[in-house]
């Protein structure tokens, strides 16, 4: 019952702010192109999944760090996803990234390519992108600034979740 109430509350709060950006779309498109190149099905965009990844991307931006885990009531991606999806069991994967966009901040295509490439070169993230059993997913990206040694870097945090919706 508590999960249903929380789910309803989150859904009502998030319905007004649902806004897939052109960068979200481009990253998702590039992931699907990569999956097809590897003989897999394209993923179907899932609005409810988007709501869960949007929450996590915003969390990473506020915290200023890359993480799969949140210090919240929904620490894992499956916990966040189950708030929005009426499903008791989630089988899937989550990819997160933070990439510097200095010099390419005006090119959505270049930024999307850099995000997807960062997952391709990571064995675990690449395996997740190529999960054969997943059929739905969503991506969210958010801009931030990362400061190191008195230098500011424009960065994009990204969260991608794919899972099997049976």
PLM region spans:
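Sec-dependent N-terminal signal peptides
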Residues: 4-15
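Short amphipathic alpha-helical segments at helix-loop
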Residues: 16, 41, 104-107
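Short, well-ordered surface patches within globular domains
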Residues: 20-82, 132-138, 142
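A well-ordered secondary-structure block
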Residues: 76-165
């Amino acid at each position: 019952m508590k999960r249903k109430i929380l789910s309803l509350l989150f859904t009502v709060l998030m319905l007004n702010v649902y806004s897939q950006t052109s960068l979200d779309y481009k990253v998702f498109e590039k992931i699907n192109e990569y999956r097809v190149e590897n003989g897999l099905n394209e993923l179907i965009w899932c609005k409810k999944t988007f709501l869960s990844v949007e929450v996590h991307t915003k969390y990473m931006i506020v915290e200023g760090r890359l993480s799969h885990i949140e210090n919240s009531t929904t620490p894992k991606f499956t916990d966040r996803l189950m708030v929005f999806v009426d499903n008791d069991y989630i089988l899937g994967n989550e990819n997160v990234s933070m990439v510097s966009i200095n010099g390419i901040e005006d090119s959505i295509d270049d930024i999307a390519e850099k995000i997807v490439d960062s997952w391709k070169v990571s064995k675990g993230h690449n395996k997740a992108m190529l999960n054969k059993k997943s059929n739905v997913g969503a991506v969210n990206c958010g801009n931030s600034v990362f400061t190191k040694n008195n230098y500011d870097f424009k960065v994009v945090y990204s969260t991608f979740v794919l899972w099997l919706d049976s």
